[in-house]
Amino acid sequence: MESKPSRIPRRISVQPSSSLSARMMSGSRGSSLNDTYHSRDSSFRLDSEYQSTSASASASPFQSAWYSESEITQGARSRSQNQQRDHDSKRPKLSCTNCTTSAGRNVGNGLNTLSDSSWRHSQVPRSSSMVLGSFGTDLMRERRDLERRTDSSISNLMDYSHRSGDFTTSSYVQDRVPSYSQGARPKENSMSTLQLNTSSTNHQLPSEHQTILSSRDSRNSLRSNFSSRESESSRSNTQPGFSYSSSRDEAPIISNSERVVSSQRPFQESSDNEGRRTTRRLLSRIASSMSSTFFSRRSSQDSLNTRSLNSENSYVSPRILTASQSRSNVPSASEVPDNRASEASQGFRFLRRRWGLSSLSHNHSSESDSENFNQESEGRNTGPWLSSSLRNRCTPLFSRRRREGRDESSRIPTSDTSSRSHIFRRESNEVVHLEAQNDPLGAAANRPQASAASSSATTGGSTSDSAQGGRNTGISGILPGSLFRFAVPPALGSNLTDNVMITVDIIPSGWNSADGKSDKTKSAPSRDPERLQKIKESLLLEDSEEEEGDLCRICQMAAASSSNLLIEPCKCTGSLQYVHQDCMKKWLQAKINSGSSLEAVTTCELCKEKLELNLEDFDIHELHRAHANEQAEYEFISSGLYLVVLLHLCEQSFSDMMGNTNEPSTRVRFINLARTLQAHMEDLETSEDDSEEDGDHNRTFDIA
């Protein structure tokens, strides 16, 4: 991830070197000190779990003010503003100086500061030298060792700030765990710290007399105590992660009393547990967001089929217990006693909300208790059936298979053939029959019979299928005169989702459930023979030629006038024997205009005999010759245009050659080109004469 340079929101506190400069600072910033000490957005919190942010500015080190929690309430704001000048010489300027660090891995285990304004609004500093370091288990051991050593120094700082009673702190405490959706970072076991890999720079501390709390070496950077140094030794390469400086007006105060406070171990363990919980919440939110973005209906269905078969070995199982399974106290493999699994399974709500009609199982427990289905044995015996994508592509194949297996799958004996039932079947080794009568009065009486039939159809010990019962009563009564048959893949078991392709075979009401065949007596009646006889007679009357007379084979009309009589042009007989004169003229003209040869025009297409035509004012040979001349002229014009273009190109090339050289060979080439064009024109004229005589209009142009 490419880091982007951004400015770190921080607070700069100035350390005056004398009381005069301190008064000038407090006088000029009288109103801003209250905002500095008591602003909500920039307040720090000294928490039981200290989180460090070792940051550096490449130009100059920045100092962030360090505050500890105290019992001062909000009313102390005005008191601190009024008394800040009086206690200027008594109040220690305790500040945290963040320097460029080369030992950031040890600094991350100690005092940790957390600014709610920078973390809450996701304004994490992204400078080019920032590296997000994640520490492993070896740093966890080092953290426990260093926490024992830093308790004394931390308590010393806390007591030192508490001794100055006028030092008012912010009463606003930031939230324990910021919201992950707003970009805040969790306080986890990974102990992510911000380490700036900048080169160590020379810093000259601004005060003449100051006390520096520095680490002795890079390993024990947080075992520190206050030591006084002179101003000439303040110029140094600051490699420790933090240096704590406090100054008074007159002389430095060296605090050597180290007080040991109670161990922070219980708070750390509770914070670790809270960190684990927050991590699981984050993972669950990520999973739920990924479900709406990356999961389609088909992929979620395939993942559901896979997870339902392999839920015994999975850490978090998305299988949902139905209401009937929880009512009959049947243990499921998806029940994990660990609290982590129960919390982490919340991330798979996208699988839980896709169950279509599972809520109906609570209302129909009386029907679903009598219907059993073993999902686990079905998954082990039959194995995964076919994926939904393959079933969607092979719908006709499976429909035919269901129709062939209708005899074996229907086992409900019914005494009354007029009773209308809805049977839901599964295409597997086990067949579940659920029957619901359309008659509301006879429904209660027929339920025990359907329950007995369904229990005899299933094999082995099984769990009750409440989702099927809910769907049974929901669909009964839609089409009372037909029978529904639902085919579901066995890999899903009782978990019937709305994604599953449900094929419905609508069978006529005359279907006999005992033998699985349609009733022959209730089939559609055959056609009336008298009606068929009438149809045949009407067709014969329409085809009679005696009443209508002779018809033209082109326009199917009789002779209308003496000028347009019916003729017999060829040896065709029957209904194709007669043709109108005008119809024949039009047909021959169309054949000539199509470019057919004279022989093709004068031959019948049906009997392949030569036409015998004695038409007035219609000469086939003359019409064909005229059309051939028109075609020749058109082709000559087209070829002439082609030759003109070719001649122009030749002249241009000749002028270019004449401009370049005056050799006799170029002149000879031009003369040969002119002769070639003249010969080509003569060939065109001779080809036109031949086409008029022979009727062949296919020419080839040979250009030398």
Curated annotation (Swiss-Prot):
Key words, A-Z: Acetylation, Cytoplasm, Metal-binding, Phosphoprotein, Transferase, Ubl conjugation pathway, Zinc, Zinc-finger
Q: Which PROSITE patterns match?
A: ZF_RING_CH
Pfam families on file: RINGv (PF12906)
* Enzyme Commission numbers on file: 2.3.2.27
Q: Where is the composition biased (Polar residues)?
A: 66-83, 95-126, 189-212, 237-246, 254-270, 304-313, 319-332, 412-421
Which residues are modified to N-acetylmethionine?
A: 1
The record's region (Disordered) falls at 1-126, 157-279, 294-313, 319-343, 361-425, 444-473, 683-704
Zinc fingers (RING-CH-type) at which residues?
544-614
**Binding site residues for Zn(2+) 2:** 570, 572, 604, 607
- Provide the catalytic activity annotation: S-ubiquitinyl-[E2 ubiquitin-conjugating enzyme]-L-cysteine + [acceptor protein]-L-lysine = [E2 ubiquitin-conjugating enzyme]-L-cysteine + N(6)-ubiquitinyl-[acceptor protein]-L-lysine
**UniProt GO molecular function:** MDM2/MDM4 family protein binding; ubiquitin binding; ubiquitin conjugating enzyme binding; ubiquitin protein ligase activity; zinc ion binding
EC class (word) = transferase
Phosphothreonine PTM sites in chain numbering: 686
| This protein's pathway | Protein modification; protein ubiquitination
- Answer yes or no on keyword Transferase: yes
Where are stretches of biased composition, namely Basic and acidic residues?
Answer: 37-48
Where along the chain is Zn(2+) 1 bound? 552, 555, 580, 583
Q: Where is the composition biased (Low complexity)?
A: 17-33, 52-65, 294-303, 444-470
| Single GO cellular component term | centrosome
Q: Spans of biased composition, class Acidic residues? A: 684-695
CDD domains tied to this protein: RING_CH-C4HC3_MARCH7 (cd16812)
- Give the UniProt subcellular location, in the record's own words: Cytoplasm
Q: Which residues carry this modification: Phosphoserine?
A: 317, 389, 687, 691
Q: What does this protein do?
A: E3 ubiquitin-protein ligase which may specifically enhance the E2 activity of HIP2. E3 ubiquitin ligases accept ubiquitin from an E2 ubiquitin-conjugating enzyme in the form of a thioester and then directly transfer the ubiquitin to targeted substrates. May be involved in T-cell proliferation by regulating LIF secretion. May play a role in lysosome homeostasis. Promotes 'Lys-6', 'Lys-11' and 'Lys-63'-linked mixed polyubiquitination on ATG14 leading to the inhibition of autophagy by impairing the interaction between ATG14 and STX7.
Q: Domain comment, in the record's words?
A: The RING-CH-type zinc finger domain is required for E3 ligase activity.
Q: What is this protein called?
A: E3 ubiquitin-protein ligase MARCHF7
Q: Which organism is it from?
A: Homo sapiens (Human)
Q: What is the lineage of its organism?
A: Eukaryota, Metazoa, Chordata, Craniata, Vertebrata
